[in-house]
Amino acid sequence: MDSATIDRATIDRATIDKTLANVYRGQKWIVATDVAAGATSAIRYMIDRGASEVMLVAAVEGVGELPDVPTHYTRTQGTTGMARVMDGVRAFDAAVTRPSRTLRAVIDRFDPENEALAIAGPFSVATEIAGRHVYGAKRPEWAALEDKMIAEELWEAAGINHAPATVVSVADAARAAVEMATLEGTVWVADNREGWHGGGDYVRWVRSVNDMADALDWFGVHADRVRVMPFLEGIPCSIHGFVTRDGVAVLRPLEMLVLRRTDRTGFVYAGAANHWDPPDLDRDAMRNAARAVGNVLRDRVGYLGGYGVDGVLTEDGFLPTELNPRLSTGHGIVAHVADLPLEAMARAVVEGSLDLAAAELEAEFVERGDAVRGGGVRYSIAKVQPDRSVDICFEEGGAVVAEEENREAVLATARSPQGGIVLVNFVADRMPRGRSVAPLAVAALSHARAAWSIPIPPLEAAPEVR
C-alpha cells in the first residue's frame, strides 16, 4: 500500500477511548518518565478516564505545565559530563528499576496494598517497578532488536535496498573503514556493550584516516564491535510504523535534525520535524521499505507497537541505517497533530486490551501528518540551564529576536536529565512547507550560543541532493 492507495477509513476513536477508560478506571498507576512536563497530557488523560490515583516518578521538571499529581523527583542525570542522551535515560531507568530505599518507601506509601500498575519509558525493558507490574512492557525478543549490529540482516530479510556495511571488532575497524570509505569517509556505530542506545550518542563520522585515532580510542572504551558503513550524503530522515495484530500501519516520512559539527568530526542529534517532504517516488519507496521491515518484525518475533527506520535520502534514493524498535519522536509528532494517545494505545495493544485496525490507523496518521506539521529542536548539553525563552524569527543572516506577532519559533532552555536542554519550537504555519528546517535549527542554536553563552559547537545542516 503506497501513499496513493491508502484506504481513508476513519479510525474508531470512540472505541479506543472506551477501551482505554476500561484500562484506567478504578486503578492506581505509577508513571515513570524522565521529564515530568512530558507526562502532563498523558496523566490528565488517565485521570479523565477514571484512574483512581496517579503518582509520577521523574528525573526533572522540564518545560511546560507539570502534572497535578504526587511527584517524586530522582534528580538523576548523566554522569559522564558529555551530555549524551543515553546517560540521562539510563540513569533514570536505573533509579526506577533498582529503586533506592527512599523511592521504594515513597511508592509503598502511595500504594500500600501493592495493587498499582506501572508505566515505564520507551527504552526501558523493566517488567516491574518496585514490585508493581509494568503495563505494556517490552518483551525480551523485542528489546534484542535494539542491537545495531543486526540492521543489515533485517534489511536483507525485508528485501529492501541498503548501503553495504560490515560488523567488526574495534581493533579491525580501521581496516574496514579503509575498504568502505567514500570521499566523505565512513560512519561507525557501537554495539550494545553498554546497553541500548539512540539519539546518535554512539555514532561517529570518520571522515579520513586523521579521525581514526580518536574514533578507535572512543569505541575502545565503549564497545567490543562496531558496524562500519560508507558515509551517506543527503537529508537524514526516518519513516515510522506501527504493528498491530492485523497488519502494519506506516506513517509519512519526516526529517531527522542530525546536524554536523564544523570544528571537528561528529554528528549532533537535535530532534525531528515533519515540515520536509521528499519527492513522491521517494516517499512511496520509504513507506514500502518500512512496511516490509514491519512485516519481518511481526513474523519473526510477534512484534507489536511502534518502530522506526532511520536513514538518509541520498542521490540514489532512501538508504536505511538503523532500526528503532519502539515509539520515538516521529510517532509523537504525528500523534500530537492527530490528537490520539498513541503511547497509551501502544501499551494496550501489547497487553491485549486493545485491537487496532492497521489500515485505519495508517489512514488517520498519514492524512493528519500531511495536513498539520510539527516537531522541533531538542539539543542536550551537560551544563544545567535555567528556564528561559524568547521569540525568534529567521533572516538571511540567521535567527533574531522577534515580537510575538512576527515569531517563527520559540527558543528556550531548561534543566534536563542530561544536565540542560535547548528547545526550538517552530510555529508550524510559518515554516516553509516541504523544505528542510535543519538550516533554521542551526540558526536558532547559533543564536542561543551567542545570546546565552551556551557551549554549542559550530554546526551545519546536511544538503538536499535528491
Segments from the language model and where they lie:
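A conserved helix-loop-beta module that forms one wall/lid of the active-site cleft
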Residues: 132-203, 209
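Phosphate-binding site of ATP-dependent enzymes
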Residues: 207-263, 313-319
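Short, charged, surface-exposed secondary-structure boundary motifs
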Residues: 64-68, 143-151, 198-199, 216, ...
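Peripheral (often C-terminal) accessory segments that flank ATP-dependent C-N-forming ligase machineries
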Residues: 347-466
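ATP-binding N-terminal substructure of ATP-dependent carboxylate-amine bond-forming enzymes
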Residues: 1-143, 171-174, 439-456, 460, ...
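ATP-dependent carboxylate/phosphate-activation module, predominantly the ATP-grasp catalytic core
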Residues: 233, 241-296, 301, 324-347
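A long amphipathic alpha-helix within ATP-dependent nucleotide-binding catalytic cores
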Residues: 222, 267-315, 360-382
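Glycine-rich phosphate-binding loop of ATP-grasp-fold ATP-dependent ligases
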Residues: 186-215, 236-238, 260-278, 331
